[in-house]
Amino acid sequence: MSNDTQPKIAIIGYGSQGRAHALNLRDSGFDVTVGLRPGGPTESKAQADGFTVVAPSEAVKSADLVAILTPDMVQKKLYEDVIAPNMKQGACLLFAHGLNVHFDMITPRADLDVVLVAPKGPGALVRREYEIGRGVPCIYAVYQDTSGKAEQFALTYAGGLGGARANIIKTTFKEETETDLFGEQAVLCGGASSLVQAGFEVLVEAGYQPEIAYYEVLHELKLIVDLFYEGGITRMLEFVSETAQYGDYVSGPRVIDASTKARMKDVLTDIQNGTFTKNWVAEYEAGLPNYTKFKQADLEHPIEEVGKKLRAKMVWLNGEQQAAAAPANQQAA
């Protein structure tokens, strides 16, 4: 490294996280260059934000620390074709997700430090919290410490994002990758969306109005998740009725029982042994035929059409200040 405390940083990618990282690090006093494909969709945005934007191959040449903040499935080719041939000796390679390294799709050069820094929040939140003087918690890991200073640089980077204002927790590439994938698949995305769809179907098939079903199983979910977010499950239970609490206690375990937990363990096993990643890479390389089919099925689920109509009347969602001037009986969903 050319500077032990203030490395020259190249941010490769300028999506939600890339933009937040670049802006926060620059505001923290770092020399930041953004590496993007010339003429790409985010080049003008980065330039408008005041960054020097060059091709990734140029950005990495003089950087002490290179942060790869592109989508997972383009990182292997990007590293092999652009980053590895051009990164200077002894620099630090940083990831925000460990999938490619942990599952051996990327084998970093032996002379590089290799670390991970992952804010636990979307890019917009990472930026917003930084701007108001707070920060989003970060996790970090060291995969390869050639210089003996890899951990220091991971912590410096996390601090530059604002993570030190909140909380920084050490992990490993293995732990971050496997728990992140499991959370997405079994709970946050796959589990939650399948639970909502199933609940909607049960109510509609029992003869209830689709609009009422939507409100009960999807719309009100935000109220519960916000309470989870603020204070855990116990806070949620404090703010719902005793009837809802009792229903939670007696019916929750009927829906999510030992057999559900066993299947969740199967999901985790497929993640741990690389089956999921192997299948995902094969799917991507085949042109995403199943992914496209699954996505279309979700788009065509009845809950989507119902939700679209109901959300059109939720003026707070689209920034409108008042509902359309129509008689009250015409405003009903």
UniProtKB/Swiss-Prot annotation:
GO terms for molecular function: ketol-acid reductoisomerase activity; magnesium ion binding; NADP binding. The active site is at residue 97. InterPro entries: 6-PGluconate_DH-like_C_sf (IPR008927), KARI (IPR013023), KARI_C (IPR000506), KARI_N (IPR013116), KARI_prok (IPR014359), NAD(P)-bd_dom_sf (IPR036291). NADP(+) binds at residues 14-17, 37, 42, 72-75, 123. Mg(2+) 2 binds at residues 180, 216, 220. Substrate binds at residue 241. Residues 1-171 form the KARI N-terminal Rossmann domain. The keyword Magnesium applies. Its EC number is 1.1.1.86. Pfam families: KARI_C, KARI_N. Belongs to the ketol-acid reductoisomerase family. This is Ketol-acid reductoisomerase (NADP(+)).
